[in-house]
Amino acid sequence: MAPYVDEAVLNDPEHIAAHDSRDTLVALATAGAQVRQAITLSREAGIERVAGGDRPRSVLVASLGGSAVVANVLELLAEPGSPVPVSVRRNLPLPGWVGPLDLVVAVSLSGRARGPLAVAAEAARRGASLLTVGAADSPLAEVCARARGVHIAVARGATSSRAALWSLLTPVVLAAHELGLLEAGEAVLFETADRLDLHAEACRPRSESFVNPAKALAIQLAETIPVVLGDGPLNGVAASRAASMLSRTARIPATCGELPDAASQIVASFDGPFTAGGGRGAGVRESAPDIFADPFLDGPAQPRLGLLMLRDAPSTTPSREADEAEALTDAVLQTAHDAGVRVMTVLAEPGHPLVRLAGQIAQTDFAATYLAIGLGLDPAVSPHVADLWDRTRG
């Protein structure tokens, strides 16, 4: 039996308050404020001193868990024009080439995540420049201080790295801009904050589901086994974040991919048992839907495969590559429709790549949170994750 979300519960303030014990929706709505505050905190901490103000030979970023996307975003933004390579590491071992000429960025909201902390400590031992982002008075801050690096403290009160993404990402983007690795200075960051504010307003809890894009998306996602697909590198990062949020926040297992590489992999799943006409040869008996089934009492008979397509804004400079990418996206969507896959699309609005990405992340973050609440779950509290930590705490 597939999950089912009654849109009435998403329009009930009491239901939302009862299940959102740690105010995840409120925290997500502060994303724009996080950007503005992080700019101020970065300037106060001396962000211009990163790597001694000199361009490093390379940049390595360590982040994981809810902040994993920080490394992915920097890699995405820097790749087109960065004069130095940017790489990602989640844990040790640190590559052998990292040394005094390189910059290592370690991100952890608590300042205690083992991977980034170990990477920062090893980088400091080798004499690399350090930029760390996380809690003040934390082990990560101490490692950075001993290495005479720059530590950007996040504002107090943040309890979840998933909901504090922009407090963690903004200093890293600003530092990369200062070093000439990408073009995303304060003007772009303030524009990003404004875009995040617009999405927070559109996705606010008291907005009815028929006008709230995140609630509407959550209702559609509820009865599916979701596959999140980005139409290119930018939305590939957004897709990875969305799949993570669906799994960790809404407790719905989700996979993700990026076009063009994942096209065959994703489309092959349309032949499987979770599509209306799929499952040929899979040992699944096909039958017509029960017209007497009550969705409130019986629930949907079987979860359907769902394709959440994240699409970029139309290109302002037409090219053959852009036309081919759009044609491939359209072909995947048509194939999904023909196979009986439930298709959902989130289209980015025009703007700087970081601004476009912010909008995509905001909408899917809110949708995953509403999906958890609609299913009667607390988006911030997972008993099984708590059990896992208890069993592995050494």
Regions found by a protein language model. Give the residues of each.
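Actinobacteria-biased recognition of intrinsically disordered, low-complexity terminal regions
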Residues: M1-H19, D390-G394
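Active-site phosphate/pyrophosphate-binding segments
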Residues: A18-T30, Q37-R49, D54, H177-D298, ...
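Glycine-rich phosphate-binding loops that contact phosphosugars or nucleotide phosphates
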Residues: D54-H199, D312, S319-D323, D330-H337
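A structural-propensity feature for long, helix-poor, extended segments
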Residues: V104-G111, G115, G278-A313, A322-T329
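Glycine-rich, charge-decorated loop segments at or immediately adjacent to ligand/cofactor-binding or catalytic sites
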Residues: S138-R148, Q265-A268, L354-A358
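C-terminal hydrophobic structural anchor segments
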Residues: R304-T364
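Short, small/acidic-rich helices and loops at N termini and domain boundaries
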Residues: P379-G394
